[in-house]
Each structure stands twice: as C-alpha cells, then as structure tokens.
C-alpha cells in the first residue's frame, strides 16, 4: 500500500527540538522542506499539518501536538476526517534498540515499549500500519534511559543524524512510488552506521 499520511512522532515544546525522541519530527520536517509543503497548526487534528501532491498523489504530513504518549489522538482525528485505512498511515519514530544510523521499515508490528506507538495502536485499534524506526542507540551507561531519549545528539553524532534523515526521506519518497513492501526490501539493508 502507498502511504497517504506520514506522521512524525515527537514532543511539541522547543526544549525537545533536536532530541533523540523527536527524530520523527525531524524526518517530516525534512520532507516538508523537500516537498515545499507548509505547516499550519490544525486545531481539529491537534497537530501541525501539511498536505500536497507528492509522487502524483495527495499526501498529508502530521506532527502531533499532543505529546508523545497521546499521539494516537491526533492521528485518529486525521484518519477519521480523511477516512483513511490505517495501513495507509506511515509512522516515523525513534528506536533506541537500533544503533544510530540504522533504519527499519515494517508493515506491522508491536509497540516495542514505545509509548507513542502504544497510543497509536490503542487509538487506531490495530497494529497493522507501517512504521519507519530510526535508530538512536542506547545510552552508554552514563545516564538513564529517559535522559538519553530526551537528550540532544552530541556534536559527533550530528553527521550520522543528517545522513539518517536523508536516508529516511529517500525511503519515504520511494514508498510513495513503489509501496512499503518494495521499499522494505531496498532500504532495510542500508544504514549509515559508523
């Protein structure tokens, strides 16, 4: 299936900008720039929303303002308004179980302990929707998990993050032309790990 709604997960306050947990926001921001898609604060959708023609089809972008743990509310509002099949919703988010620079695209799956994904699965009533996980790596032990996830990338990590964003936007663009299954086979073996 071809994605019609691309959701980046993150937290809305400026203090969360450029944190590991907001890498989903960073990906859809990069898509908006590439596709010259403007954001506007959409009250009904509880998030920043943009739409345009990408790959010859209407495609929507969403960054929920509901905070990570309630992301499903915003996504559900868009799905209901546009009468979308959950399988046409591609969710982009961070995964600390993947090393920095690695991405994994899947057509379905569990929340894997990610609270944003738990909210989406609960509000959509299914886990059968595609997701693109971007590796943020685990803490080196000097800080706890929450501090790691909500922390900013180090200067030495930023070049890898930029390459990850490029690879993620390339994978999403490919999925709009060729679907999730073909994109998985091409991009799941590629990464920008050091």
UniProtKB/Swiss-Prot annotation:
Question: Residues at site: Stabilizes the basic form of H active site to accept a proton?
Answer: 94
| A single GO molecular function term of this UniProt record | tRNA binding
UniProt KW keywords: Cytoplasm, Hydrolase, RNA-binding, tRNA-binding
Q: What is its EC number?
A: 3.1.1.29
One Pfam entry name: Pept_tRNA_hydro
- SUPFAM superfamilies named among the record's database cross-references: Peptidyl-tRNA hydrolase-like
**Where is the site labelled Discriminates between blocked and unblocked aminoacyl-tRNA?**
11
Q: Which reaction does it catalyse?
A: an N-acyl-L-alpha-aminoacyl-tRNA + H2O = an N-acyl-L-amino acid + a tRNA + H(+)
Q: Where in the cell is it found?
A: Cytoplasm
Q: Which Gene Ontology terms of cellular component type are present? A: cytoplasm
Supply the enzyme class, top level: hydrolase
Q: Where is the active site?
A: 21
Read off the InterPro entries from this record. Pept_tRNA_hydro, Pept_tRNA_hydro_CS, Pept_tRNA_hydro_sf
What does the entry give for GO biological process? protein quality control for misfolded or incompletely synthesized proteins; rescue of stalled ribosome
Q: Which domain of life is it from?
A: Bacteria
UniProt: tRNA binding residues: 16, 67, 69, 115
Q: Which family does it belong to?
A: Belongs to the PTH family.
Subunit-structure text: Monomer.
The protein's job, in short, is: Hydrolyzes ribosome-free peptidyl-tRNAs (with 1 or more amino acids incorporated), which drop off the ribosome during protein synthesis, or as a result of ribosome stalling. Catalyzes the release of premature peptidyl moieties from peptidyl-tRNA molecules trapped in stalled 50S ribosomal subunits, and thus maintains levels of free tRNAs and 50S ribosomes.
The protein, known as: Peptidyl-tRNA hydrolase
Give the originating organism: Synechocystis sp. (strain ATCC 27184 / PCC 6803 / Kazusa)
């Amino acid at each position: 299936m071809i994605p019609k709604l691309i959701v980046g997960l993150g937290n809305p306050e400026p203090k969360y900008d450029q944190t590991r947990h907001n890498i989903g926001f960073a990906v859809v921001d990069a898509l908006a720039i590439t596709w010259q898609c403007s954001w506007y604060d959409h009250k009904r959708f509880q998030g920043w929303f943009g739409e345009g023609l990408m790959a010859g089809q209407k495609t929507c972008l969403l960054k929920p303002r509901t905070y990570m743990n309630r992301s499903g509310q915003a996504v559900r509002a868009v799905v209901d308004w546009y009468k979308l099949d959950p399988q046409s919703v591609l969710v982009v988010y961070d995964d600390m179980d993947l090393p920095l620079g690695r991405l994994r695209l899947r057509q379905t799956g569990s929340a894997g302990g990610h609270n944003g994904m738990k909210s989406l699965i609960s509000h959509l009533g299914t886990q059968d929707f595609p997701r693109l996980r971007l590796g943020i790596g685990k803490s080196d032990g000097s800080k706890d998990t929450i501090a790691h996830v909500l922390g900013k990338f180090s200067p030495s990590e930023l070049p890898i993050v930029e390459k990850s964003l490029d690879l993620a936007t390339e994978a999403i663009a490919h999925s709009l032309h060729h679907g999730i299954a073909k994109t998985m086979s091409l991009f799941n073996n590629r990464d920008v790990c050091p």
